[in-house]
């Protein structure tokens, strides 16, 4: 059962801050700065896609420091008439990890008949500022049995995250304060009632197959394909190059709201 968060993102949904941590200057507490990102949006045009998402949009990072992705709220809306069949699975991915089961941070399944949906994911791990600047997170989307002509957008997704920004990694205990949705590994969240379209396949398996398929076929409509070669088969693309073909799915400039930032 998914944990649904309605309205404004509430930091207390993810972090249990004591009164002293809220009142004391940051130098006297383990928490440097707790922030809520701006909204990033993905317009889904394909039945299966792997798109980059900026979960730290608008977050001021510390040079030479760290950022902990505590949690995020994902909102989705079907751009379809009522009572359509089919559904979707949405999975958050850390693209640095080569093993698919370790790359999947959480997934969610819902039917197209549920016009709007919202769920919470708690990754709760830190990365360096340098890695964060490389935009390491992706979203794997698998739409099944939604009959829409090619070139249209059946689904829109929006992402807002709660994170902790800090300079030094010497004080421990932050992870103990974070609300845990599931301590047994990557989450698989689902609605109580899901259309029969959904196959019993973990999202980590879908990710592994998608990566393999993408690396074999290479990006579409690439004008530089085979450039500098006299002929023959095009040179296979690396995984990093393949990822670029999905950049057009991201609407970086489309923001529906600007989230607040709270520092302690």
UniProtKB/Swiss-Prot annotation:
Family assignment from sequence similarity: Belongs to the tobamovirus movement protein family.
Entry's localization field: Host cytoplasm, Host cytoskeleton; Host cell junction, Host plasmodesma
GO MF annotation list: RNA binding
Domain of life from the UniProt record: Viruses
Keyword list, A-Z: Host cell junction, Host cytoplasm, Host cytoskeleton, RNA-binding, Transport, Viral movement protein
GO biological process, one term: transport of virus in host, cell to cell
InterPro entries the UniProt entry points to: TMV_movement (IPR001022), Viral_movement (IPR028919)
Annotated segments matching region Disordered: 211-264
Compositional bias ranges of the Basic and acidic residues kind: 237-247
A Gene Ontology term for the protein's cellular component: host cell plasmodesma
Function, in words: Transports viral genome to neighboring plant cells directly through plasmosdesmata, without any budding. The movement protein allows efficient cell to cell propagation, by bypassing the host cell wall barrier. Forms a ribonucleoprotein complex with viral RNA. Binds microtubules and modulates microtubule stability. Can bind double-stranded DNA. Triggers host hypersensitive defense reaction in incompatible plants harboring resistance (R) proteins.
Source species: Tomato mosaic virus (strain S-1) (ToMV)
Name of the protein this chain belongs to: Movement protein
Signal sequence, renumbered to the chain: none
Subunit organization: Binds to host RBCS at the plasmodesmata; this interaction seems required for viral systemic movement. In resistant plants, interacts with host MBP2C at host microtubules; this interaction prevents virus cell to cell movement. In resistant plants, interacts with host resistance (R) protein (e.g. tomato ToMV resistance protein TM-2(2), AC Q71BG9) at the host plasma membrane; this interaction triggers host defense responses leading to programmed cell death.
């Amino acid at each position: 059962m998914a944990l649904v968060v309605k309205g404004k993102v509430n930091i207390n949904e993810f972090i249990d801050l004591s009164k002293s941590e809220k009142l004391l200057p940051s130098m006297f507490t383990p928490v440097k700065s707790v922030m809520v990102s701006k909204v990033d949006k993905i317009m889904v045009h394909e039945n299966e896609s792997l798109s980059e998402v900026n979960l730290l949009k608008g977050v001021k990072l510390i040079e030479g420091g760290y950022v902990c992705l505590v949690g995020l709220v994902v909102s989705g809306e079907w751009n379809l008439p009522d009572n359509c069949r089919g559904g979707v699975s949405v999975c958050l991915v850390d693209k640095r990890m080569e093993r698919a089961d370790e790359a999947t941070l959480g997934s969610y399944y819902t039917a197209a008949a549920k016009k709007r949906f919202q769920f919470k994911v708690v990754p709760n791990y830190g990365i360096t500022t340098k890695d964060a600047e490389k935009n390491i997170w992706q979203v794997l989307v698998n739409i099944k049995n939604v009959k829409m002509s090619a070139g249209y957008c059946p689904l829109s997704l929006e992402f807002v995250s709660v994170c902790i920004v800090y300079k030094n990694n010497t004080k421990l205990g932050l992870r103990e304060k974070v609300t845990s949705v599931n301590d047994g590994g990557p989450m698989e969240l689902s609605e109580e009632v899901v259309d029969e379209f959904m196959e019993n396949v973990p999202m980590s398996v879908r990710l592994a197959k998608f990566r393999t398929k993408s690396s074999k076929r290479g990006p579409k409509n690439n004008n530089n394909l085979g450039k500098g070669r006299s002929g023959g088969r095009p040179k296979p693309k690396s995984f990093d190059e393949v990822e670029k073909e999905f950049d057009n799915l991201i609407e970086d400039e489309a923001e529906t709201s600007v989230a607040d930032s709270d520092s302690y």
